[in-house]
Amino acid sequence: MEESILRMHDKTTLKNMAFNRGLSRRGHNGRNASRMRKQDFIDFIMVQNHRDQSAVLGSDFLGDDMIRIFQEFIMDETFTFNPFIHLMGTIKNSTSKSPVSNQPSPEEDEPIPDLTLKPLEPCTKCECTTCMKNSIKQEENLKVHQNILNLESKIMCVVCQANVRNVVFVPCNHLATCISCSANPLMPKKCPMCRKGCKTTIKIFF
């Protein structure tokens, strides 16, 4: 269901729809269910709709369009977790041949997927059409490889640099660390990205 259609419903209707889709009393967007606004209910329903659609796709190909969309959202360090959840859910399902059986336990960290590109075989320099095409492909692969490295640096935990970020710090709403790092008793009660005080954290499961 499109967001524009959801906006036509009143808050009570959206609340009932959200509870039917699995909303708990703990709420969404850092608010308890009793304190959620109309937009919070819409955000929750949209996330659930996207997860349902992604589960049906089951594709194992991460296309250029997905990388481009992903980059547009994460180029800004001040992004919040709502669009990030939306994209990470898609990527998780699109890179898994069995989305249901391969999902990690909610309390386990998710490692960064291996997105290494296989380079083209080198050839001697010449002016033939085949070699020129291979040269162009090599340049394109290098650009894509660099983009992937940039993406990995954006989605990795800013503390351990090994696992996927899946813990949101409230109230700044930065998606910054993995579950293990956020649970470390030695870690200060501050967001590691903006250094602002943290009132609570929210675990995001994809």
From Swiss-Prot:
Regions of compositional bias (Polar residues) in chain numbering: 95-105
Zinc finger (RING-type) residue numbers: 157-195
Keyword Zinc-finger: yes
Pfam families, per the entry: zf-C3HC4_3
GO molecular-function term, one example from the UniProt record: zinc ion binding
Disordered: region residues: 95-114
GO biological process: protein ubiquitination; symbiont-mediated suppression of host apoptosis
Keywords in alphabetical order: Apoptosis, Early protein, Host-virus interaction, Inhibition of host caspases by virus, Metal-binding, Modulation of host cell apoptosis by virus, Zinc, Zinc-finger
Cited InterPro entries: MDM2_MDM4_MUL1 (IPR051652), Znf_RING (IPR001841), Znf_RING/FYVE/PHD (IPR013083)
Classification via Gene3D superfamilies: Zinc/RING finger domain, C3HC4 (zinc finger) (3.30.40.10)
Keyword Repeat: no
Function comment: Plays a role early in infection by preventing host cell apoptosis.
Family: Belongs to the IIV-6 193R family.
The protein's name: Putative apoptosis inhibitor 021L
Protein's organism: Invertebrate iridescent virus 3
